[in-house]
Amino acid sequence: MADTDAAPAAPAPSTPKKAAKKKASKPKTPASHPKYSDMIASALESLKEKKGSSRQAILKYVKANFTVGDNANVHIKQALKRGVTSGQLRHVKGSGASGSFLLAEKTKTPKKAAAKKATPKKKPAAKKTKKPAAKKATKKPAKKPAAKKKVAKPAAKKAAKPVAKKATPKKKVVKKAAKGKGKKK
């Protein structure tokens, strides 16, 4: 039993040592290149393709102009997907990280125009607050006639139901007459 007690005690001290080593190694590796999103943006600007640049062309440009590791392809794929979802890039063809990409600069200018329009929208907002009060006044009288209509509607429904019942026996009578004619022949 002494052996089993010693065995669990040994792994416990070894795990904190490993955690301490990992924490020390993280600050030692500074990036020797800009963000992948920035590198992709510079690649798209310099390639200047009308229909957009492919991931492979972007990868070639990044490897030629920046010092990146062997896993740059994976990082570029992820950065392209993030750029499309954030709106920084526009996906021209394909899906995911395949296809052609362009910088989405056109979407930035409407945002500025929308910000300018936001201040005039405040004035109509005050007018809109007055309009709902008028709408509420119109809704209240509308509810009262609606209640009267509900009283009238059940009477109409009762009248409609017997009419429907009368219509169905007539159809059956017609069918019986047709059957009778067939039997006589």
From Swiss-Prot:
GO biological process: chromosome condensation; negative regulation of DNA recombination; nucleosome assembly
GO MF terms held by the record: double-stranded DNA binding; nucleosomal DNA binding; structural constituent of chromatin
UniProt keyword annotations, A-Z: Chromosome, DNA-binding, Nucleus
Span list, region Disordered: 1-37, 90-185
Domain H15: 32-105
SMART domains named among the record's database cross-references: H15
Listed PROSITE patterns: H15 (PS51504)
Ranges of biased composition (kind: Basic residues): 109-185
Any single GO CC term annotated in Swiss-Prot or TrEMBL for this entry: nucleus
Subcellular location: Nucleus; Chromosome
Main localization (coarse): nucleus
Ion transport listed as a keyword: no
UniProt keyword annotation of DNA-binding present: yes
General function of this protein: Histones H1 are necessary for the condensation of nucleosome chains into higher-order structures.
Family the entry assigns: Belongs to the histone H1/H5 family.
Protein name: Histone H1-delta
Species name: Strongylocentrotus purpuratus (Purple sea urchin)
